[in-house]
Amino acid sequence: MKTIIVTGTPGTGKTRLAKSLSIILNFTYIDVNKIIKDSKIYTKFDQEKQTFIVDVKNLNKVLEKIILQSKKNLIIDSHLSHYLPRKYVDLCIVTKCDIKILKMRLNKRKYKEEKLRENLDAEILDICLIEALENKHKVLIIDTSRRLNIKNIKDLICQRLKN
């Protein structure tokens, strides 16, 4: 079974891409945010940033169990998915986005200034990409600034999974 993770700064198009790919590749879509909330894999809720503070170690244990028990190919969607150990992941897709477009997307979500700045900085500094590379993942970068050609992305993924 194959496992693809989709990571990137919030607002870069992870979920849209992951859901589209799960359909075209016939992979099972895993929504990590739902798992975090349903399984209460967080230490607290940060009121200021309006976000859960996630226990990444426990999240990885839950995701590893899902991967090991799965009889299907998986696409795991989360800005935290790149923390999974390399041995469980066949391909790591990192979504990137033009900073002006990302700012518009985050403003539509009504992010407060501090959270907005934090996410824009993370994108500018390539935090998710660098951390994915540090974790030795096989990385495919997808720019989601423009309309995506899912067929071309599917072909790229299939090629990468063969290598």
Where are these regions (language model features)?
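NTP-dependent small-molecule kinase module
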Residues: 103-104, 108, 133-163
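Walker A/P-loop
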Residues: 15
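ATP-dependent small-molecule kinase phosphotransfer cores
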Residues: 28-84
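P-loop (Walker A) phosphate-binding loop of NTP-binding proteins
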Residues: 9
